[in-house]
């Protein structure tokens, strides 16, 4: 999900969010003199999300706009979750989001070759069941929070330029790291925030690895080396006020007073299409460096007199992500049995999230009568910083409050998720969910929790 409004409202807005990572494009065409909508022109790649619309073509309005390069999307999501056992407290909550995206292909609209603009706005409401659980490591609803107490919140607004027959792609403006790095359209087949968008250890482990629904000032360049490989890098503002109402999340505010450095990610990807069945895969390896100096957890530990203690350090991140279709069951890139796995690492001296491992599978098209229904299975494992754990152990011994907002010593947490996505109608999906959280908040003093729920998504 992602993009911006640049002219008149119907002219420029394209809203997408981390969950929608499919791509499509804009069309450019001519109106007929008969009052009959012209057929849509095939869109160029990566301009707008390719989705179904509940309201259809709106009497030809949508097709006419897209033929001029204007792509609009209104999207609503509700995530309901209730922990039926375990956690600190039982209860049920709903987290909700309405998103508007506008993507404009300026080549079709004004003849500017390769230029597109993207804007996204959201409104979020509701409450997270993980607050009842007492868990902030892997929230059971990914759609909650970070959008400010406002009616309309700007997520991103940026321009994108493709050159050299789309082998070179440059983007700049208000955007987040998650939009282009360490992410996949497959990840939001799951409701738990451990994976939806990108692996939680990356944005939670470093503010520089910014994520939806907030953007920062940034520039990014991607070079497609061969048809199935690319390398990309960028420079992103690191804002210590990110996700907070005071500095960042209020409406259209982009307060830079809390800037502390820059975040520089680099990612290499290999995207094969194997065999006669074109079994699609994505293999990514990435690295991120945050120039901010963070206070080391070591500085809070008791040390031997005269022994030097490292007080500050930069954070570095590393990730390896893989997904591969094993059996094809339809024409689309996600129509089949797909295995996925990943690993992410932070500097545990300055980041509470040390490492994350996940493995999962998605099965779409297994039922010929319902080709868009999807089964998802995911197992996620997060380890917390051992240095942070040592600090928390000392705090427990002296009866002090725990660091990191914890209520006990944090070590590791595991989450198992299973779901079944039912395609109800065009643009409408309903997904019953089951999640089991082992050691909520990575603590032994919070009971394992069983969570039942569902996710509803409507694309208008």
Give the location of each predicted region.
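N-terminal periplasmic/intermembrane-space "pro-region" immediately following the signal or transit peptide
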Residues: 17-79, 83, 89, 107-111
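Short loop/turn motifs that connect adjacent beta-strands in outer-membrane beta-barrel proteins
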Residues: 56-72, 105-117, 164-167, 228, ...
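Residue-level signature of outer-membrane beta-barrel architecture
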Residues: 65, 78, 104-108, 160-163, ...
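Transmembrane beta-strands of outer-membrane beta-barrel proteins
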Residues: 70-76, 113-120, 168-173, 227, ...
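Outer-membrane beta-barrel pore domains and translocons
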Residues: 77-81, 120-124, 175-177, 236-238, ...
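Outer membrane beta-barrel
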Residues: 91-241, 351-356, 363-393
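Outer membrane beta-barrel transmembrane domains
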Residues: 252-257, 267-269, 286-316, 328, ...
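Outer-membrane beta-barrel "beta-signal"
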Residues: 448-460
């Amino acid at each position: 999900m992602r993009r911006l409004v640049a002219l008149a409202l119907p002219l420029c807005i394209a809203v997408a969010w981390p969950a929608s990572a499919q791509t499509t494009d804009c069309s450019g065409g001519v109106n007929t003199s008969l009052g009959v909508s012209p057929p849509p022109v095939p869109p160029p790649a990566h301009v707008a999300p390719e989705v179904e619309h509940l309201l259809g073509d709106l009497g030809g309005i949508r097709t006419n706009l897209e033929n001029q390069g204007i792509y609009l999307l209104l999207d609503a999501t509700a995530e309901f979750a209730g922990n039926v056992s375990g956690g600190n407290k039982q209860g049920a909550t709903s987290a909700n989001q309405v998103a508007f995206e506008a993507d404009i292909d300026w080549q079709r609209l004004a003849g500017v070759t390769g230029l597109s603009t993207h804007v996204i706005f959201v409104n979020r409401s509701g409450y997270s069941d993980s607050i009842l659980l007492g868990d902030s490591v892997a929230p059971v609803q990914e759609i909650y929070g970070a959008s400010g107490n406002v009616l309309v919140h700007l997520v991103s607004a940026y321009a994108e330029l493709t050159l050299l027959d789309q082998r070179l792609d440059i983007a700049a403006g208000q955007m987040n790291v998650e939009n282009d790095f360490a992410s996949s359209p497959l990840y939001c087949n799951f409701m738990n925030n451990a994976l939806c968008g990108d692996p939680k250890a990356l944005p939670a482990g470093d503010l520089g690895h910014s994520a939806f629904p907030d953007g920062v000032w940034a520039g990014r360049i991607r070079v497609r080396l061969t048809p199935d490989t690319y390398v990309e890098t960028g420079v992103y503002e690191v804002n210590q006020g990110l996700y907070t109402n005071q500095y960042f999340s209020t409406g259209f505010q982009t307060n830079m007073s809390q800037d502390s450095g820059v975040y520089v990610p680099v990612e290499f990807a290999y995207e094969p299409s194997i065999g006669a069945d074109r079994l699609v895969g994505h293999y990514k390896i990435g690295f991120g460096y945050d120039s901010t100096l963070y206070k080391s957890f070591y500085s809070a530990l008791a040390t031997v007199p005269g022994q030097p203690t490292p007080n500050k350090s930069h954070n570095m991140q590393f990730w390896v992500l893989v997904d591969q279709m094993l059996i094809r069951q339809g024409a689309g890139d996600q129509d089949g049995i797909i295995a996925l796995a990943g690993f992410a690492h932070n500097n545990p001296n300055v980041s509470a999230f040390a490492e994350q491992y996940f493995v999962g599978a998605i099965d779409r098209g297994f039922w010929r009568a319902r080709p868009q229904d999807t089964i998802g299975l995911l197992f996620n494992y997060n380890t917390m910083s051992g240095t942070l754990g040592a600090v928390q152990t000392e705090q427990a011994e002296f009866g002090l409050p725990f660091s990191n907002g914890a209520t006990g010593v944090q070590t590791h947490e595991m989450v198992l998720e299973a779901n079944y996505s039912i395609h109800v109608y065009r643009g409408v999906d309903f997904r019953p969910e089951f999640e089991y959280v082992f050691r909520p908040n990575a603590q032994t003093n919070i009971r394992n929790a069983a969570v039942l729920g569902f996710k509803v998504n409507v694309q208008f």
